[in-house]
């Protein structure tokens, strides 16, 4: 994680940050336009279970489908590829779809090596999560202004979001490290098993 942060804050590579911004734009647009619909889908355990199952099946074949990777670093990454990866990332707005997996698959589809696709996915998570948190806070403020204006609530929100952000970043880094070493198959089997178990639980009431 420390190594990734050093790369992230290497301000000598300004073009890298512009490419990250380009990659975040699709999520910002779709998140703004369809946030209410996404919240509705989150309330459906059947949608989550189904996407976990179907997504797991897709992951079993990813390493075989996307081959001949030629993009090894951000200097070889075009803005078009960054935006396309960002579009893939928006699939994570569907409940049950992994953001990291979606963006890594998008990277591999755009000829990134699995290692660089994982690295770019990690970097892309930072502005994406910050933007999502900021939007939710703004939405909460519009609905209930006292949430933000109260000092006690503001401190609680700040601590809660900071802890959630740190835990999410660590979890993403672990997940990406796992994918770099083992590929998508094991994660695919896990999602299939979890999806089947959830569907059985839903069916049995």
Regions of interest found by a model, annotated:
Residues 1-205:
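Multi-pass membrane proteins that catalyze or facilitate reactions on polyprenyl-/lipid-phosphate substrates
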């Amino acid at each position: 994680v420390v190594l990734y942060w050093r790369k992230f804050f290497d301000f000598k590579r300004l073009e890298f940050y512009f490419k990250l911004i380009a990659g975040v734009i699709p999520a910002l647009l779709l998140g703004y336009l369809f946030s209410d619909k996404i919240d509705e889908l989150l309330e459906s355990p059947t949608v989550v279970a189904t996407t976990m199952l179907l997504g797991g099946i897709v992951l079993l074949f990813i390493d075989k489908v996307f081959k001949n990777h030629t993009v090894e670093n951000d200097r070889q990454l075009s803005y078009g590829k960054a935006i396309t990866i960002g579009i893939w990332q928006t699939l994570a707005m569907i409940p049950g779809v992994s953001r990291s997996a979606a963006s890594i698959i998008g990277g591999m589809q755009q000829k990134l090596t699995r290692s660089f696709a994982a690295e770019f996915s990690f970097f892309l998570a930072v502005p994406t999560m910050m933007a999502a948190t900021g939007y939710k806070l703004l939405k909460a403020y519009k609905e209930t202004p006292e949430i933000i204006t109260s000092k006690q609530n503001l401190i609680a929100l700040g601590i809660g979001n900071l802890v959630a952000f740190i835990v999410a970043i660590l979890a993403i880094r672990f997940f990406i490290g796992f994918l770099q070493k083992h590929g998508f198959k094991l994660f695919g089997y896990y999602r299939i098993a979890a999806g089947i178990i959830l569907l059985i639980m839903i069916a049995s009431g």
